[in-house]
């Protein structure tokens, strides 16, 4: 498994979490995080992003950003696994067995495609706000921040839809979470790719 975990994105995340553990006397369980990375890399192994990069790099980047705001092992693992139920053969049941029920429930809560039906981002955000799932809202927000960085590859019509959704749903979410720095970044990407 150690060779499987050897890459720049993985090392960057693990180094950051190790630093958090030492600097803030936190106890992020690095063994569990490594296991989650292994699962993300394994289950996303045949997937590529629109940029051509291996897909697993996206959830690692989301987890890296999440670690700026949350020092909880379950939250970081949820960020790493956030697309697995939706985009791979990994199931909620398998996640519960390998990690715990909380992580499995959180990954499921972030899954938009269920039973052939896709939930809109705004509906998911409203549900998570009503349930006071701040950590999951954070993951959802940072997922959008990482995804919007590559919308230049999308067709113009799809790009415009993503920008509008970001302006109407995710910038207000950043403000709701009291993360003005994220709102500013999202707005800059929207402006950059608007034309």
Kindly give the residue locations of the regions a language model identified.
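Active-site helical microenvironments for divalent-metal-assisted chemistry
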Residues: 1-195
């Amino acid at each position: 498994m150690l060779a499987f975990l050897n890459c720049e994105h993985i090392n960057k995340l693990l180094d950051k979490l190790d630093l958090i553990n030492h600097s803030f006397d936190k106890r992020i369980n690095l063994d569990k995080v490594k296991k989650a990375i292994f699962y993300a890399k394994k289950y996303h192994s045949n997937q590529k992003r629109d940029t051509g990069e291996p897909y697993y790099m996206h959830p690692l980047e989301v987890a890296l950003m999440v670690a700026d705001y949350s020092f909880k092992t379950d939250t970081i693992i949820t960020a790493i696994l956030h697309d697995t139920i939706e985009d791979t053969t990994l199931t909620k049941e398998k996640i519960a067995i390998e990690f715990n029920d909380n992580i499995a429930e959180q990954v499921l809560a972030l899954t938009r495609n269920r039973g052939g039906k896709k939930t809109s981002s705004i509906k998911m955000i409203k549900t998570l706000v009503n349930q006071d799932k701040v950590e999951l809202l954070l993951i959802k927000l940072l997922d959008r921040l990482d995804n919007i960085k590559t919308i230049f590859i999308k067709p113009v019509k799809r790009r415009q839809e993503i920008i509008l959704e970001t302006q109407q749903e995710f910038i207000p979410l950043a403000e709701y979470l009291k993360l003005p720095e994220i709102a500013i970044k999202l707005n800059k990407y929207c402006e950059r790719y608007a034309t």
